[in-house]
Amino acid sequence: MMNMQNMMKQAQKLQKQMEKSQAELAATTFTGKSAQDLVVAELTGDKKVVNITFADAVVDPDDVETLQDMTVQALNDALGQIDEATKKSMGAFAGKLPF
């Protein structure tokens, strides 16, 4: 029984550490950029869009498609950063599971 109690305590401790890491990640802002930084997207670690900035040079009513492509590029850049940070942050817990 003592072994099971220790496992439960370890699991609870890990859960608290994971929750703390998730909260820290959610509070972090990631900045994704398109080519030449013409579109910049800011997202939180929990993948909420905070801000999107367009350089004057990219705002052309006759070429909306380029603006759309650059926006997607900036968002995907930020999302990739979030995924990497999540793997790094949460991957640390994988080897610590008591079972």
Curated annotation (Swiss-Prot):
Gene Ontology MF, one: DNA binding
Keyword Coiled coil: no
UniProt superkingdom: Bacteria
Family annotation (Pfam families): YbaB_DNA_bd
GO annotations of cellular component type: bacterial nucleoid; cytosol
Alphabetical keyword list: Cytoplasm, DNA-binding
Subcellular location: Cytoplasm, Nucleoid
Biological function: Binds to DNA and alters its conformation. May be involved in regulation of gene expression, nucleoid organization and DNA protection.
Record-stated family: Belongs to the YbaB/EbfC family.
Subunit structure: Homodimer.
Entry protein name: Nucleoid-associated protein stu1598
Organism: Streptococcus thermophilus (strain ATCC BAA-250 / LMG 18311)
